[in-house]
Amino acid sequence: MQNIYQQGLDKNAANYTPLSPLTFIERTAYIYPQRTAVIHGQRRYTWLETYTRVRRLASALADHGIGEGDTVAAMLNNTPEMIECHFGVPVLGAVLNTLNTRLDA
């Protein structure tokens, strides 16, 4: 049963776009390029800057032979670079294996 306020608001191209994490960052960089995406200490990145850095990481990994089905391990703190890994590695169809630096052995 639909909520009374949802009647007549079926999903369509004008009000709904299914997004994966990869299509999310691409679409957000297109629609909100100058909005802040990441704040880490004194560093700030817009959505366009973040997306550009993600694409640059993906390109560098591809240049080193990383591709679909490969696994990339990353041992990083919770930094903008880790966010870039979460998007940049899957762009290639590879899997990201994160190694948390805050956990004891």
Segments (PLM) and residue ranges:
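Structured binding elements
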Residues: G93
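Flexible, non-catalytic linker and terminal segments flanking ANL/adenylate-forming cores
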Residues: M1-P18
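Anion (oxyanion) recognition and catalysis
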Residues: P90
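Short beta->alpha connector loops at strand-helix junctions that form conserved
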Residues: L99-T101
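Conserved AMP-binding/adenylate-forming core of the ANL superfamily
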Residues: Y16-T17, E26, Q34-T79, I83-F87, ...
